[in-house]
Amino acid sequence: MIKLVLIRHGQSLWNLENRFTGWTDVDLSENGLSEAREAGAILKKNGYTFDVAYTSVLKRAIRTLWIVLHEMNLSWVPVHKSWKLNERHYGALQGLNKDETAKKYGEEQVHIWRRSIDVRPPALTEDDPRYEMNDPRYKELKKGEFPLTECLVDTEKRVLNYWHSEIAPSLKSGEKVIISSHGNTIRSLVKYLDNLSSDGVVSLNIPTSIPLVYELDDDLRPIRHYYLSMDGEVPEGEFPKHIVF
């Protein structure tokens, strides 16, 4: 049996401020650092180990992974970073407070932008200071490939491209894999693995820094999945509560 561990990064500074983050490279909050340490302790206590790790090129996911591996005495594990595991690009909404945006555009419109799978938020323009095309971490991207906004379908497409080309082969070769990424990135993977409908993924919430374990067969089809806590598996439909760590 193959086990895959997915983990959303710990609480970020903009999660704390209730702002749209997307590709903006914000760090973890103090609470997020604590959540990451807790996740590492949970995995260590439950006897997990890893051969390889995957993450995005955004520091909140990278730092979460570093902390998790450090807590597990696995800092030596190879880490592969890719923009294809970045959070969904929220376009011109990036940096805006979610409540203030809802007051400006209406709660229904903002809900559509956030939760529908095929509606993109307003796009950035290339002269916007939030446009990251010249950032060296994206040097492999050509101008027409760099997103100015994304819907969940766009995010899912790049995430699954990376899944099939890099992650799935690692799992099939017998490597123990952890992925530290973002809410919509993990939603995309869960949608694919569990063959969720569009309605199913709309209501799917991924908590910060709680290890989500998938048990897979040899063809990477899910047998079952569950969240982990210090006490082991968490009953389906429940999230473990964070502790002060």
From Swiss-Prot:
The active site is at residues 9, 87. GO terms for molecular function: phosphoglycerate mutase activity. Substrate binds at residues 8-15, 21-22, 60, 87-90, 98, 114-115, 183-184. The gene is gpmA. InterPro entries: His_Pase_superF_clade-1, His_PPase_superfam, PG/BPGM_mutase_AS, Phosphogly_mut1. Catalyzes the interconversion of 2-phosphoglycerate and 3-phosphoglycerate. Pathway: Carbohydrate degradation; glycolysis; pyruvate from D-glyceraldehyde 3-phosphate: step 3/5. This is 2,3-bisphosphoglycerate-dependent phosphoglycerate mutase. Gene3D superfamilies: Phosphoglycerate mutase-like (3.40.50.1240). The record marks 182 as: Transition state stabilizer. Keywords: Gluconeogenesis, Glycolysis, Isomerase. Its EC number is 5.4.2.11. The keyword Isomerase applies. PANTHER family: PHOSPHOGLYCERATE MUTASE. Belongs to the phosphoglycerate mutase family. BPG-dependent PGAM subfamily. GO terms for biological process: gluconeogenesis; glycolytic process. It catalyses: (2R)-2-phosphoglycerate = (2R)-3-phosphoglycerate. Pfam families: His_Phos_1 (PF00300). The keyword Mitochondrion does not apply.
